[in-house]
Amino acid sequence: MLIVVTGPPGAGKSSYIRAHARPVDIVIDLALMALAMAGPGADHHDHHPVLLRVVHRARQAAIHEAERHLDQVDVYLIHTMPQAKARAHYKRLNARIITVDPGEHIVRQRVRDMRQPAMEAVVTRWYRDRRKGGSRPVTRQSSRAW
């Protein structure tokens, strides 16, 4: 089964997957992929544009291949803000959509703590889209200790 985990930056999408995925499951997480492909000592969130380009291509290839094995393993895919085309594709695959949203105040504090000001715009867009009728929270997660 395909499990698509959505939510704003800093919501706890990776934590949700760590709590639910089994060792045999496939996890496609752009942030983890970037960290795995970056050089030693790389920042966990601030990556060079060339690295991100490579990681995005690798992510697409991983998604394409993983979709061929949904009858054998569960595939956890982080997709922060899937647009209509992606949501329709996930629906055709009978994906389960999980939205992780601990609340805007908590998310904004986590993004500030990560010192990633560029993510503030993504958080704003995510909540704006949600208020317009986009994704609805399925999972409320309390704040976690870092």
Task: Give the label of every model feature segment.
Residues 7-13:
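Conserved glycine(s) of the Walker
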Residues 22-92:
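Conserved nucleotide-sensing/catalytic segment adjacent to the nucleotide-binding pocket
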Residues 2-4:
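Short hydrophobic/aromatic beta-strand immediately N-terminal to the Walker A/P-loop
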Residues 16:
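Hydrophobic positions on the alpha1 helix immediately C-terminal to the Walker A/P-loop
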